[in-house]
Amino acid sequence: MTSARILATVLSAGSLILAAPAIAHADDWGSAQVVAGRERVKVTVTGTQYPVGHCRIDPSIGTPDTQSIAMHPSGTIVINNLKPGTHRVAVWCPQGGVISETDVQVQPGNLLLDLQDQAYAAAGSSDKVTDPALR
């Protein structure tokens, strides 16, 4: 393999990694996946192995906009009305479970694309939805 091919392979693999959602692991405690969208993030928690009643999500930890939002210990939640920019999203489950902090880039809102996404979702064409946090 030539140097140019090796470089092209490495660069293309890097671009795939950048396009992937952020996944935070806590070994056998479970995992949290955070996907940023337009003024929202989607958080999915899976694999919690201990009996926990709920998990907590903070989509803006370390800022004046910090919150603590409850969610089921295995499931998905979409948190709306976030300011565009970098957010550190914290996920933790009391009594054991996922503990993670993930940096994501929240995009600015776009009313026309949001309306289009709602129409696609209502028509059963969720594969055409443009906001990753709504897929």
Where are the regions that the model predicts?
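Secretory targeting and sorting signals
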Residues: 1-26
